[in-house]
Amino acid sequence: MDLYVYDSGKEVSTLNAILSKNEMKKMDVIFGPMHQKQIKPLSDFAKKNDIRLVIPFSQKGEEVFNNPAVYQINTPQSYLYSEVYEHFTRQFPNAHVIFIEPISADKEKAEFISGLKQELKNKGISMQTVNENATKETLKAALRNDKENIFIPTSGKNVLLIKVLPQLTLLVRDNAGQNIHLFGYPEWQTYTRDHLESFFELDVYFYSSFYTNTLFPAAVQFTNAYHKWYSKDLSSKYPNYAMLGFDTGFFFLKGLSRYGSELENNLSKMNLTPIQTGFKFQRVNNWGGFINKKVFFIRFTKNFELVKLDFE
């Protein structure tokens, strides 16, 4: 395997200098770039020379819709919603959903909540709404004895979690026989340290296209290897870029070693276990590339177990 690594900087001129090198036209796959303004010229180059282009960072850009060789790893959230809805109704077929609305509406989750309500309606799943100031008694009145009660805030912000967690915790403690969960969003993993005990007590779920935990064996092994190679610790950003790079590189290099030019016809057979970021590629249209529609559910059980649910 021949591996070429370049610093493309921030400017298109720097990228063009790299693309002018003779070896660039012979690549099997190119990973990058980091900066948005470099994506189109790199996509044009990859398309002209029939080279796979894996875009790991940006959620923006139209290149994936008109270049069949583009793979977009970091998919816009709206493209994942249908996957979340399908996984949700499969995980909770006997659900009663109780939406918790903030006093000031959060437009960021409006599309997700609207789509989820329509999916619940289509599946005949009952639902109702309370506001963020609901007391324990109000929350109890919303419960169904014959259902799995799922509370879903209509905002992903930490300020709403801080507001509702105390009342939900009291509710769960006073109604131990009831089946109650709290369901939320990818950004909740950044609040986990603040609310860890509550997450376990409330049997919390949230969805995400990436997740890892320092207790997972694969993550421990990777972290130790990273420290050995680079004599520094991993950053605490979400997602972790080092793990993103490893998962992405491993997927495509393994795929090319297995299937070569037939990789695109065998993507569904690539059942690798990632450290952080999973892959489920779907072609966007007949003339476009692939977006990553992989979604996990992360569960904090009452037995203090952390479970990463994979639905494929």
Predicted features by range, described:
Residues M1-E312:
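Extracytosolic ligand-binding ectodomains
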